[in-house]
């Protein structure tokens, strides 16, 4: 995750969890509609800008046999300057967004820890 020193660093957060770079599961359930496609497309487009050094799209990491192993990978490239970053928060399995409220503190704590490990922070 190399970054320059003059461009913008953009952090996008989408807590739903079923976010990946390819074969989006649009319509799988109520949580996999247009937002998942929008945030992936937005991260890619921002990563193409000359004034942007790096874009991280943060979501929940899922280790769940009912979903693809892709969602268990902590890091996935979207483009040269854009990545999906998966952070542990709450249970490992996929849960509907309405059940995520109790786990947002965990997501925040783990995200802050991850950010503090990054070279530019």
Locations of the language-model features?
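Short, conserved, GDST-rich strand-edge loop motifs in beta-rich repeat architectures
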Residues: 22-27
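A conserved catalytic-core segment of Leloir-type glycosyltransferases
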Residues: 2-20, 32, 41, 45-120
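Short-chain dehydrogenase/reductase
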Residues: 28-37
